[in-house]
Design a protein with these regions (language model features):
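SAM-dependent transferase fold signal centered on methyltransferase-like domains
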Residues: 1-200
Length: 200
């Protein structure tokens, strides 16, 4: 009886299609894992029982402050210090290597189970989708109204939030589609937050 030497997680167009295992007759102390999504590739070696912890988590206060500061500097004509949002591709999601991903790309986790990451700098080669955060709000009705002023439609997604994407879209009175992206999630302090983004 052999053991697994390699794991290949293959996604096409953001959908996980195959999980391929390479086994041989040797005993292995570590397993080579390769996550592929179209042209994106992320590889690492997994040692049994080894798991990279998540980096510092973002609480709602930090997130709102960073988002507000970026927006204020843009309105004042000063060079903006934008906030970027990163969503791993389907293969990374299947592999569950979020701590390693964040460490390798210098990102902070938005929340413990959100699987979304933020940074003040744009990261080249990130395996997944990248967005610039144009605004952030709690679920406070007035804050949401100000955040979504003039936006009639958006692509809505939720991560670690008690509402489905359809429920959130209805609550926000948005049509599906357009070039705006709305992410609903839970920050590290347990606050439900809404991020308004543009895809890069």
């Amino acid at each position: 009886c052999g053991s697994v030497a390699e794991v290949h997680i293959v996604s096409v167009g953001g959908e996980c299609k195959e999980l391929l295992l390479v086994a041989d007759s040797d005993t292995h102390d570590s397993v080579s894992v390769t996550c592929v999504n179209d042209t994106e590739r992320f590889s690492f070696t997994h040692t049994d029982g080894e798991q990279q912890p998540l980096p510092p988590l973002q609480d709602a206060g930090e997130l709102l402050a960073a988002s507000t500061a970026a927006a204020a500097s843009q309105h004042a004509g000063a060079p903006a210090a934008p906030l970027y949002l990163y969503e791993p591709n389907a293969s990374i999601m299947k592999a569950g290597c979020f701590g390693l991903l964040a460490l390798r790309y210098g990102l902070n986790a938005l929340g413990r189970n959100s699987n979304l990451f933020v940074s003040n700098s744009l990261v080249d080669g990130f395996p997944g989708r990248q967005f610039v955060v144009t605004g952030c709000s709690t679920m406070n009705r007035q804050s949401l109204k100000a955040l979504l002023a003039g936006i009639k439609s958006a692509n809505v997604a939720v991560r670690n939030m008690p509402l489905s994407a359809d429920e959130l879209r209805k609550k926000l009175a948005l049509k599906d589609g357009g070039d705006s992206y709305v992410f609903g999630t839970t920050a590290a302090d347990g606050t439900h937050v809404i991020l308004l983004c543009k895809r890069i």
